[in-house]
């Protein structure tokens, strides 16, 4: 069945992964239009290559790795790094209580923001994140620890 997932239609692919990839790219890029572009490029690469995977987890990891690389390319090419406003986040359907957390998360350095998003939002283990980012699991654990500390300071200092 996993091999069939590499051959699913574009609509099925978007339904299955589109929203999670968009949230991930939005956190990395801080710009909805750039996030949409990164998701489209990621899905296009998937469709062009038609990779086969042994499991849905491997497929998902491949997509998020490609999306992360696309986001990094966008950040390298950009001369500025716009940040989402609270109004833009509210327009994406976030609850008011989530806005403070999302705003604080957006203010963190990329390496912490990325680790926290992959672990707590997307549900990846430290080992999976380490593999995606080319780091050791212990380095990811340290990023998560430091990221939580920074996020707490961001949230409570902002009150």
Over which residues does each language-model region extend?
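DNA-recognition helix of helix-turn-helix
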Residues: 68, 72, 133-158
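Sigma70-family region 2
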Residues: 2-4, 30, 41-58, 77-79, ...
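A short pre-motif secondary-structure segment
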Residues: 115-119
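C-terminal flanking helix
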Residues: 22, 43, 109, 113, ...
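Internal acidic/polar
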Residues: 73, 80-105, 125
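Arg/Lys-rich amphipathic alpha helix in sigma70-family domain 2
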Residues: 48, 54, 64-84, 146
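Structural recognition of an alpha-helix C-terminal capping motif at a helix-to-coil junction
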Residues: 23, 37-44, 57-69
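A short, charge-rich alpha-helical start-of-domain segment used by transcription regulators
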Residues: 1-23, 36
């Amino acid at each position: 069945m996993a091999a069939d997932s590499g051959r699913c239609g574009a609509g099925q692919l978007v339904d299955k992964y589109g929203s999670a990839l968009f949230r991930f790219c939005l956190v990395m890029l801080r710009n909805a239009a750039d996030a949409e572009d990164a998701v489209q490029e990621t899905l296009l690469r998937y469709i062009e290559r038609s990779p086969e995977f042994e499991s849905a987890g491997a497929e998902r990891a491949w997509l998020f790795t490609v999306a992360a690389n696309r986001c990094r390319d966008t950040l390298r090419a950009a001369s500025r790094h716009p940040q989402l406003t609270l109004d833009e986040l509210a327009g994406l359907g976030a609850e008011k209580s989530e806005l403070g957390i999302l705003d604080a998360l957006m203010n963190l350095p990329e390496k912490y923001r990325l680790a926290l998003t992959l672990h707590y939002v997307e549900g990846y283990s430290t080992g999976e994140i380490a593999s995606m980012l080319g780091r050791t699991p212990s380095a990811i654990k340290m990023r998560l620890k430091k990221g939580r500390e920074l996020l707490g300071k961001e949230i409570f200092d902002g009150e």
